[in-house]
Amino acid sequence: MRKKFIYMTVSLILLAFLLLAPVQAAAASSEGLLLWFHTLLPMLLPFFILSRLLIALDGVSGITRFLAPLARSFFGLSPNGSFCLLTGFLCGYPVGAKISADLVRENRITPEEGAYLLTFTNNPSPAFLTGYCLTEALELPERVPVSLLLVYGAPLLYAALTRHRQTFPDLSIEKKTSGSQISFKIVDACIMDGLENILKLGGYLILFSMLAKLLLLLIGSLPLCSCLIVGLLEITNGIALTAASPILTKRAAWALSLFIVSFGGLSGAAQTESMLQGTQLSVLNYLKAKAGTALLTACFAILYLGLTDLPLALPLLAVLLR
């Protein structure tokens, strides 16, 4: 009932926005659509199709041959789980969630391993972090190495802290795909699955772009609140606002942007939930893990700033913990 009430309220708010401010609403919708068409569609659709095909044809083991032993030693993952680890760190939101859910549906990993993977493998892509966030928006390309270390080190540390010494079974030994099962029906099914999921992402991106624009119209006179609220809602707009904020220095904007990109936004959480349908994986546990990871990232970023500028780090820490 609570979820239904939230969805109904948001729907009514967006409908009112469309009716009362059609120009601004249409502009926000257009921005979301263009971001989907120019970025998500060409980047994620081929990966959705090919990763689904690899799972269906049991081709994961060849890709993770060298990573699997390390992933098992440090995180207790199965070989199929190490594939999710690899793709979730390389390919961006919400690929980690989709691969986890696909592997659970195909009985390639246990639901327990899927839930564990979901807590740390759904991350921003290196291309988004280094290209858009650090180079285009913040204009801090010199911070690329330390940013990569913080943003990807935090979820790995979170995973290590929450593992509880558990080792997950390798279900790929029990389930193999024979050559007689390989046909164009499998390819067709993978293509349709990819198209369905990429269309869902487009819809969510449009809706959350409209919400972000509405929030900007309502609280635009409060720059720091705008950065935090919009960033927690949708990371692309949040990072753009943070980078352009007149009250934040470059260093403070960098730390806040890492917090935003590590959390992934409620838009990313909604996209993640859409990927989890048909499984028992919980989006609430995912949100708790992302909040913990974002706080770890922010603390490490502030610590890094504190090593060179303590007077700046202390007020920034107070703002983030308020």
PLM segments and residue spans:
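Transmembrane helical segments that form the transport core of multi-pass membrane transport proteins
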Residues: 187, 191-261
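Transmembrane helix-loop junctions in multi-pass membrane proteins
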Residues: 19-30, 56-60, 131-132, 211-222, ...
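Juxtamembrane inter-helical linkers in multi-pass membrane proteins
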Residues: 69-81, 170-186, 230-236
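Juxtamembrane and boundary regions of transmembrane helices in multi-pass small-molecule transporters
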Residues: 2-3, 105, 135-138, 142-178, ...
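Selected transmembrane alpha-helices and immediately adjacent juxtamembrane segments
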Residues: 9-24, 29-41, 45-49, 53, ...
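Alpha-helical membrane segments and immediately flanking helix-loop junctions
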Residues: 74-138, 229-247, 252-279, 288
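N-terminal membrane topogenic signal
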Residues: 1-9
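Transmembrane alpha-helical segments of multi-pass membrane transport proteins and ion-pumping complexes
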Residues: 39-48, 52-61, 89, 93-97, ...
